[in-house]
Amino acid sequence: MNRILDHIGIGRENAVTREELEMRMGLPDRTIRNMIEAARREGALIVNDGSGAGYYISDNLEDLKRQQKMNNSRAMSILVQQKHLRRRIKELEAKENA
């Protein structure tokens, strides 16, 4: 996977914030976020409970359900924005082609 997993603990009690990860790894926030996303895409069960406690690896049913719910909410928000973007793009393209 990627080396971010060497710095993210297992279980909520071992959660680490992005700021801590930045300090430990000497990397900027955006790089840390990209590494977390890449590890998740590769199958790492990195969760963030939204409380500010940070990131941790979990195999706990409730943790995973909470993360899934947060992910679904984000995905729906993006899809709604995409709908508005598509509509506006069509309007502008029609105006341009008129």
What residue ranges belong to the model's regions?
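Short, charged/polar, Gly/Pro-enriched secondary-structure boundary elements
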Residues: 61-67
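Short amphipathic alpha-helical interaction segments
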Residues: 27-38
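A short acidic, leucine-rich amphipathic alpha-helix
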Residues: 17-24
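Long, low-complexity, charge-rich intrinsically disordered regions
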Residues: 67-98
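Short, leucine-enriched amphipathic alpha-helices that occur as contiguous helical runs
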Residues: 1-5
